[in-house]
């Protein structure tokens, strides 16, 4: 179920299901009342994770999105707020989860862990700190390591990120106002509950299927 005003899931819907974890998508730069959702998750012992790939920089009640859950994902794919061409990031304050993510990111090895965590793992599984320890697989893993070129591109863009986010916000204001004022055709997306909207795109929710089909037809071959 979705709330068309905020482009988000309604918090009361969450209460209907017996969940162990919730992977919440902050869609297109917007979010629902995530503080309410977090309170529900805390009360019901639901692990809250944020998919923040489209909302880098959006602020809600004094906090940037991506800081409400146990962890948050960010995408640096082409077209997002900042780009490394491919790749992304996972942010967390949980040391146990961070250790697991570093292991899974690189084949299941412990090479990217600090010395203390390496020693703890090797002691737990009785692995000698020799040549063989570098080729011990502690878990199923992938090769998700970014390249130096991707990292260079990302680092170069960081100093422009604030400017990019502000420009996206300004573009959204300029484009959305005339669209949402046409209340006979479109639902207005509310963003006043946000301290800052770092949107990914301008959501257009048509009031009828006919209006939607007209827009799609006009964009054929253009987009």
Protein language model features and the residues they cover:
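Active-site phosphate-binding strand-loop segment of PLP-dependent enzymes
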Residues: 18-84, 89-99
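Hydrophobic side chains within alpha-helical segments
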Residues: 6-8, 57, 83-84, 89, ...
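Di-metal (Zn2+ and/or Mg2+/Mn2+) metal-binding site signature of metallo-dependent hydrolases
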Residues: 1-14, 81
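Short, well-ordered alpha-helical packing segments
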Residues: 11-14, 38, 102
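PLP-dependent aminotransferase class I/II
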Residues: 21-25, 30, 34-36, 43, ...
């Amino acid at each position: 179920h979705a709330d068309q005003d905020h482009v988000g899931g309604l918090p009361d819907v969450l209460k209907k299901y017996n969940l162990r974890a919730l992977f919440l998508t902050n869609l297109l730069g917007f979010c629902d009342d995530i503080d309410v959702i977090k309170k529900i998750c805390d009360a019901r012992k639901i692990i809250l994770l944020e998919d923040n790939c489209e909302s880098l920089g959006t602020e809600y009640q004094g906090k940037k999105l991506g800081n409400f859950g146990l962890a948050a994902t960010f995408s640096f794919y082409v077209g997002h707020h900042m780009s490394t061409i491919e790749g992304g990031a996972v942010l967390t304050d949980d040391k146990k989860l961070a250790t697991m993510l570093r292991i899974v990111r690189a084949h299941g090895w412990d090479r990217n862990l600090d010395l203390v965590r390496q020693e703890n793992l090797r002691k737990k599984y009785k692995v000698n700190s020799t040549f063989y320890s570098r080729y011990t697989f502690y878990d199923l893993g992938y090769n998700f390591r970014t390249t130096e070129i991707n990292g260079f591109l990302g680092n170069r863009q960081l100093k422009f990120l604030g400017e990019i986010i502000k420009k996206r916000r300004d573009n959204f204001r300029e484009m959305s106002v005339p669209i949402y004022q046409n209340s006979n055709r479109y639902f207005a997306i509310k963003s006043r509950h946000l301290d800052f909207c770092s949107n990914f795109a301008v959501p257009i929710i048509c009031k009828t299927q006919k209006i939607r089909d007209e827009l799609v037809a006009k964009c054929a071959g253009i987009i």
